[in-house]
Design a protein with these regions (language model features):
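Loop-rich non-cytosolic ectodomains and luminal regions
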Residues: 1-130, 134, 157-161
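Helix N-cap motif at beta-to-alpha junctions
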Residues: 136-143
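Short acidic amphipathic segments
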Residues: 143-158
């Protein structure tokens, strides 16, 4: 069943996870908190270098943003691991070339330097996309249905007012 979820942001594993003594993965390690929206909705015309950043914005693969009939379905595209991988790699490459973004992140001592973003790209190209969590906004009934799916290990909620 398709769930009624608002935009879903997926957290992607971009480096090897540290394991504790019993081989249990330590999700509190210093893995960068980075990912992508897997059901995007775009309402503006954006242009980018499609050769340099293929599939940067799924569903908006044409430069002619005025013709909605030519847009791909972003949710369908991102169901394919190869499309999701290409999209995420393009996002990381795009970020690694944004000098203002990198300067801002550097001041915050983040994991988002050009070198670290390129290392993330290498990891994704070698290991593929591994989503380890996601965030969304949904009502109680939707989350209860979602919690019954076998792929869902745990749900953490906060009330939004």
């Amino acid at each position: 069943d398709k769930q009624d979820l608002a935009e879903v942001w997926c957290a992607v594993q971009v480096a090897e996870l540290e394991k504790e003594e019993e081989g249990v993965v330590n999700f509190q390690s210093n893995i960068p908190n980075i990912g992508f929206v897997c059901n995007p909705s775009y309402n503006t015309a954006i242009k980018w270098d499609e050769k340099k950043y293929p599939n940067l914005l799924p569903g908006c693969e044409t430069q002619d943003m005025g013709n909605e009939d030519e847009w791909d379905d972003p949710e369908e595209n991102l169901k394919s691991e190869s499309n999701a991988r290409q999209h995420f790699v393009s996002l990381l490459n795009y970020l690694s070339n944004q000098k203002k973004f990198l300067a801002m992140m550097e001041k915050d001592n983040s994991n988002y330097t050009t070198k670290e973003l390129k290392e993330m790209v290498s990891y994704i190209k070698k290991n593929g996309i591994k989503v380890y969590g996601f965030t969304t906004i949904a009502d109680k009934e939707t989350l209860l249905k979602l919690s019954k799916q076998s792929e869902v290990y745990e749900i953490y909620t906060e009330e939004v007012r």
